[in-house]
Swiss-Prot record:
<keyword id="KW-0456">Lyase</keyword>
<dbReference type="GO" id="GO:0016829">
    <property type="term" value="F:lyase activity"/>
</dbReference>
<keyword id="KW-1015">Disulfide bond</keyword>
<dbReference type="GO" id="GO:0008081">
    <property type="term" value="F:phosphoric diester hydrolase activity"/>
</dbReference>
<feature type="binding site">
    <location>
        <position position="25"/>
    </location>
    <ligand>
        <name>Mg(2+)</name>
    </ligand>
</feature>
<dbReference type="GO" id="GO:0016042">
    <property type="term" value="P:lipid catabolic process"/>
</dbReference>
<keyword id="KW-0964">Secreted</keyword>
<dbReference type="GO" id="GO:0031640">
    <property type="term" value="P:killing of cells of another organism"/>
</dbReference>
<comment type="function">
    <text>Dermonecrotic toxins cleave the phosphodiester linkage between the phosphate and headgroup of certain phospholipids (sphingolipid and lysolipid substrates), forming an alcohol (often choline) and a cyclic phosphate. This toxin acts on sphingomyelin (SM). It may also act on ceramide phosphoethanolamine (CPE), lysophosphatidylcholine (LPC) and lysophosphatidylethanolamine (LPE), but not on lysophosphatidylserine (LPS), and lysophosphatidylglycerol (LPG). It acts by transphosphatidylation, releasing exclusively cyclic phosphate products as second products.</text>
</comment>
<dbReference type="GO" id="GO:0005576">
    <property type="term" value="C:extracellular region"/>
</dbReference>
<keyword id="KW-1061">Dermonecrotic toxin</keyword>
<keyword id="KW-0204">Cytolysis</keyword>
<keyword id="KW-0460">Magnesium</keyword>
<dbReference type="GO" id="GO:0090729">
    <property type="term" value="F:toxin activity"/>
</dbReference>
<feature type="disulfide bond">
    <location>
        <begin position="47"/>
        <end position="190"/>
    </location>
</feature>
<protein>
    <recommendedName>
        <fullName>Dermonecrotic toxin LhSicTox-alphaIA2bvi</fullName>
        <ecNumber>4.6.1.-</ecNumber>
    </recommendedName>
</protein>
<feature type="binding site">
    <location>
        <position position="27"/>
    </location>
    <ligand>
        <name>Mg(2+)</name>
    </ligand>
</feature>
Amino acid sequence: WIMGHMVNAIYQIDEFVNLGANSIETDVSFDDNANPEYTYHGIPCDCGRSCLKWENYNDFLKGLRSATTPGNSKYQSKLILVVFDLKTGSLYDNQASEAGKKLAKNLLKHYWNNGNNGGRAYIVLSIPDLNHYPLIKGFTDTLKQEGHPELLEKVGYDFSGNDAIGDVAKAYKKAGVSGHVWQSDGITNCLLRGLSRVKDAVANRDSGKGYINKVYYWTVDKRATTRDALDAGVDGVMTDYPDVIADVMNEAAYKNKVRLATYEDSPWVTFKK
């Protein structure tokens, strides 16, 4: 999965997919009442990027639905996975469950079209703080209450705070999650970060006994870092430059080892070599 980073304006969906992304990451900010409000990152953000692009969250969801609904004039068949980077740092811990409920209602209405031929992309809810694990239950309970438990098949989870792998496992246990887990690791492109935790996550994924199904590394903008990440065995790389990742995947060392994921590749099933 080549994951376009910080895709917060509707026009950027096409821009990143056309550069080679089959997945995007979108920031979600919340208002004081835990309503998802804008797709907005703000300052500071990655070096070389504008931090200030935004849409109203519901408008973005409608644009995303168009891009991921077969038959729509804006349909992009390659776009199969969306990571919502939930900026829950602005919320009190006791609002996490409420944020999950409201997120579920927004997605159900504006993205899944109330279960009636909505967008088809898989969704990852990425949460920066382990203490906000109740967001997951708020989300899953709401989809069930609204009569659409089947949509949970399209939803996965990520804790993005670079916490110890054992602590992340405990948070999932509390949230009642087993499966559909992506584990992120990374840092802004302005700084360097080693791959030791990525390797730990890959080992957990491949052990058959861990909680992780997929691993992604962010933010990867250079060819050398891309090669290191692919060599470490990641499933996804998040990038500001999808074309750089695509180029490296076409290099002789990789072109017979890795390929771009398609809609038929489940993002929840650990790939067996």
